Each structure stands twice: as C-alpha cells, then as structure tokens.
Amino acid sequence: MAEKNWQGFFDMLMHHEGGFTDDQRDKGNSQGDGHGNEGSTMLGVTAFNWAKWTGKPAPKEVMRALTKDDVKPFYEKDYWTPIRGNDLYSGLDYSIADMAVNAGPSRGAKLFQRILGVTADGAIGNQTLKAMHDNDPLDLVEKYYDAREGFYRKLDDYSIYGKGWSRRNKETFEKSKTLIDL
C-alpha cells in the first residue's frame, strides 16, 4: 500500500529530528548508553538506542558523527516495520510512523488501535488492518492528529516541549493529507 512512502517519510523525519542534542530534561534523551555515557541524541536517535542497535558504547563523539545513511536502517527496522508502514493507508503511514519515532512504536500503534476500536495491544496486526480498511483514510488521519495532540497535552513536560510537539504533529498531519489516495 504505502511502500513507496518509506523514503519520503525518512526525509520528513530528518527535517523534524535535526542534529545533535544533549537535553537532560528530555525523558526520551536522558538515558545513557548503558556504558557510562550520558544520554544524547543525534538525528533523533538516542545514545541508548544506538548502543543497543550497534552493540557498542555510544559516547558523544560517536553520536555527533552519525549520518543520515547511518540511521536510516535503524529507523526502518525499529519504527517503520513494527508499525507496518508498508501496509497502512498512504498518508496514515506518515502519521503513525512519526508518532512511533516520537513516543515509541507501541504507543503509536495503541493510539491508532483506540481510534479504530480494536484491542489496543500495541502491535498492528491483521485485526487492526481489517478495521483500518473499514474506515475512510482522511477521517483516520484527522482522528489520529487529534488523538496525538491529546496525548501530548497530558504529558508532564508539555509546558517545556509542547510547542515543538504540536508543530511537528501539525506538519505531519498536513503532509499526511497530501499523500492520501482518494
């Protein structure tokens, strides 16, 4: 369905994720790599996740040196594939995959499953896909945007990061609408 969208999603993701950060207030960033190195993020990949992916320590100098080509397979395997991006409606794939990167694949999937009224187990399977096909793509993208915004507003650190999360959600929503096959 949406296999053609992987590269476009990755490009949009790189726009949102940007370069190197070391914000210890960020709960998604503050965990170290498990080897005594403080948490940092490059192109949206945390030191913890990069160390897990490579099986090697991820000190700041390693993180700063990461390139888009380095992280692309990581994002495809750990985010796009678990949310079954290739099986989702075009446009909806962007919305769910971006939430998966921002809040975890399971959360991204559960948000979608709640919208569909199916068991929210965090794994997009055949039941979820069947329910998706019983719904209008644009309606699902709109509902996902609203649900994602609601999720962010409930977070304790919304006062710190909310403006950026809301901007990202809106940009993803607008892009998602342009990709829907009507």
Stretches found by the model and what they are:
Residues 1-182:
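Cell-wall polysaccharide-cleaving catalytic domain and substrate-binding groove, primarily
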